[in-house]
């Protein structure tokens, strides 16, 4: 399991701003992945979080290219591309320079978001990427003092434990909820101890960059800060370079907490836990729960995708069936219309029975012979002396009727 050490565990004094560092060295960008247990139900009350620095780069193009490869290799974690010496919100894809997701559609959306973010940054250059610390007003101070007196009273009477007291300082929740949260936290801590022998904290293959230092800004130690922030202070090839950089930073920023770490390993951070082994156990358990959660999400996603595919296939079959029915209906209507047209054409033929009687002494036999001719001689030749009012389309319609009778 990974090891990490803190160069400074001093609790920071109140800061007015958290600003960017001046440019340093030839490494300008780096890739980082986060583990945020609060995003998983089982571990959201564990006071632990983790990060892994993958590598450092000279240019953004090289960093983005490597981030794509890292994302393919470590499919369970998003890979962020950020700039050395700048302040960023913890595990916040909307506040980073670039991020690689597993899904290509999300990557396309990220590019669109980045374009709009760049436009906003151009309009807000006066802020210089600083996180302003909000000064609490008198009313807020009075309310916080009342809450503290209530916590002290409950603790002095033994109504809440020390862990619940410390938790109430961080979480703005009623006492009964704090007790429930404390129970969940204790269960998670016990599970973490049981899982200590199984290592879920993977390590990257070695790269040229070996060590680094980082500052993590917590709302617990910086009054008025509303979110976790971090700033990578340097990446180095040797331990000597690292120590030299940390010493210089302490002289310039005496109130900053500066942590050292090894590149390519998961590093734990906690506001309340000073024991590195305990922190690693909690981070290890959090990683297991996170990986289980990712696997479940993928399984549910595949189920939803299969169900959606089946629904689409069924809908396609229904549409195809309806189309066939519509075509048959159209054919029936066309045939019916043709028959009606033929009947109309036949009814418009003039009566020539008197002419036939004067030229033929046996009309009955002629009629009989005509029927026989229909049955045995194929297509009937229409008489040349037929009324010219019957046009070619009428002749064709009559012929269709005769063919229909014959068949």
Swiss-Prot record:
Keyword RNA-binding: no
Signal peptide boundaries: none
Bias type Low complexity, positions: 344-370
Keyword line: Coiled coil
Coiled-coil residues: 96-130, 287-345
Region annotated Disordered, chain positions: 302-394
Pfam families assigned to the protein according to its UniProt record, in alphabetical order: DUF5832
InterPro entries xrefs: DUF5832
Compositionally biased region (Basic and acidic residues): 302-317
Compositionally biased intervals (Basic residues): 318-331
Listed name of the protein: Uncharacterized protein R435
